[in-house]
Amino acid sequence: MGSPVGLTSQEVTTRQLQGLVNNLDTKTSRSLAHILRTNVFTRFNAILGALFIAIVLTGSLADGLFGLVLVANTVLGTAQEWKAKRTLDRIRLLHSPTSHVIRDGVNQLIASHEIVQDDVVVISAGDHIAVDGVVLSSENLEVNESNLTGEADAVMKLSEQRVFSGTFVTAGSGTIHATAVGKESYAQRITAEAKKFTRPVSEIQDVVNRLLAWMLWSFLLLAPLQVWTQLRVDGDRNWQEATVRSVAGLVGIIPEGLVVLTTITFLTAAVALSRQQVLVQQLPAVETLARVSVLCVDKTGTLTTGIMQCDPLLVLNSYDETELQDVLGALADDLAANATLQAIGQKFPSTQAMHVIAHIPFDSLKKWKAIQVDSGSWYLGAPEILSSTDVSVLRKVQDLAHTGARVLLLAHSPTPLTQNALPSQLEPAALIAIKEQVRQDAALTIKYFCDQGVDIYVLSGDHPSTVAAVARAVGIKEDHVRGRVTPEEKRDFIEQLHTRGEVIAMTGDGVNDVLALKKADIGIAMDNAAPATKAVAEMILLDGKFSHLPTAITEGRRVIGNLERVAHIFLAKNVMSVFSIISVAVLSQPFPFLPRQMTLMSTLAIGIPAFFLAIGKSARRYSPGFLSRVLQFSFPAGVAIGCAVVVVDISAPDDSGTAASITALVAFMWIVSVFARPFTARNAVVLATLIILAICAFSIEMLTEFFSFSVTTHNIALGMAGSFCTAGVIEVIHRIQH
């Protein structure tokens, strides 16, 4: 164990070489191996790989074109995710948690992951404890262990008692001896459970996972039927043809690219927000913010700049102002001073004239701190706590609070300090008014949320009149203001809103906001927030600007809107394939397409346009019912396309699949045009390019031979007739739904 001066540089180096470093597993980033594993070794890739092998065995390599698309999707998804990961990791590194340690007798600020075993770590109110350890010294040290025990009440920590990583300091200060770091720490050993506690719920990911499960079950149930049907129709003459036709139908059920597009969409949103100084710590948070119905904000640092200015003292009961200034300087002379105490310290610098015998640190629950000097004990805190019965003092407090000032009372007692208890003899000595500047962008940001139908509540530990004055200045209704709320009351208020079915975002910067941030659907911290606050937040505003939230909501809406559009297309294709497989089984017909033709349709009418739709702009307001809207459109649209394809194929003079391919291509491009509205220049260019490529596939001899198209007047007319009828049905379905 290190000496009181901490480890030496040589001892630190020795432990680093031994691997006794606090390297932590991040919950927001995946390794390259993990990215490769999740993009390559998937159930759908395994199925497509097996189908590709079946095609290779038939010798019809051209029909294995979907294998190249599979590789392209995998490479694209891996490359995009790796690029986004590196971008986000660089930003996270710049804003990674820090800790104070004593090394070579000097208090040093280092990244928390650089702590080594046996380091002496200095902790104070608001700090997130990064390692397991034993308390060496305690100055009224209180730790919240709710992450580990579920108990919200802070625990007083004395010398020789243990503290654990993942907890945070609510009051006081102290030093600890790091006994377990990195994977050996308690919090890291229960990481899986800890992650469950804070991960945001993603409706999008839930819906996509359900769609993928539906498609997988469709494949497993219909694969035997498809193979049996095609062997029954063509097997006697040509098992290779039966295999190829079987694969064509089954490939259509597989949602090539849907998982990749979902991941890319979330990542591009996170990268875009990082450029706007918003760090996304959990990807689903982007979507969650767009679904928010209630926004709860803290006053200080969110509605105000957090920069405080202390007004001259309002002396009470004939106390000597010079002595009061010395007392305030001594009270503010605290390494763990919060913004309020720092403002007091700047106004009344410590002169060292006071001999401090004992002190009690500030606690957001009791709302006061105290020191004992030769002249008695001095208490600084909330007026209604320190002087709850003095009507004249409370009236002065009310008058000052109505101006928007934060008001503190300095009170004196001749008796010595009693730990965490107020004396019976306590006389008001002075009122201190501290003013904060309201953010210039706060009113516009609040108006934006109100226009979007989001209810806004202010939850603050300040005097209700102070909070109400600031709320009025930015346009928040007074009945939505809650003052003098404790951390537990903030948490309980969030829980109460949840019982009404609200989706809640909570912003905060203090350790008193941690419990509420964890209960909210999405917690948002300012960059100057306490380490514990940033540790539990899903988003961090890196420059502390509240005005970035509308941008984040726009990105969330883009994610939801774009993935909904993409899901419509993929599910319609799945339904078409399922309907076609069942229909040809009933009618004892060969499947209408070859695998290469399905690949052409999937690429030009689904894969490429879906990619551009997934990264495009979309500012539509969120409304519940993602899955129901997708099903209400995609199911009838897919059935309509499948019906048209089967009818057209049976009516065609040959079994080349040309007419069916034209029908399906045009129909799916019509779906793309429906969800690309209103057209932007980019969408118009993309759609026009895809149409030209489709025309080339049916008009250039080399391509028609490759795709086995029989381009005759009859096939073209039949295909166009089927596609026009289907496009009309799709348009009607879309208009009815909207």
Which ranges hold each PLM region?
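Actuator/coupling domain of P-type ATPases
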Residues: 4-6, 16-27, 31, 74-76, ...
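Alpha-helical transmembrane segments of multi-pass membrane proteins
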Residues: 20-22, 37-63, 67-77, 96-97, ...
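Hydrophobic alpha-helical transmembrane segments
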Residues: 60-96, 103, 198-294, 449-452, ...
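Cytosolic catalytic regions of P-type ion-transporting ATPases
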Residues: 65, 96-209, 409, 514
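Conserved beta-strand/loop elements of the cytosolic catalytic core of P-type E1-E2 ATPases, chiefly
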Residues: 76, 106, 179-182, 195, ...
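Membrane-embedded transport module
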Residues: 226, 479-505, 510, 520, ...
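Cytosolic catalytic regions of ATP/NTP-dependent phosphoryl-transfer enzymes
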Residues: 291-427, 434, 447-448, 463-468, ...
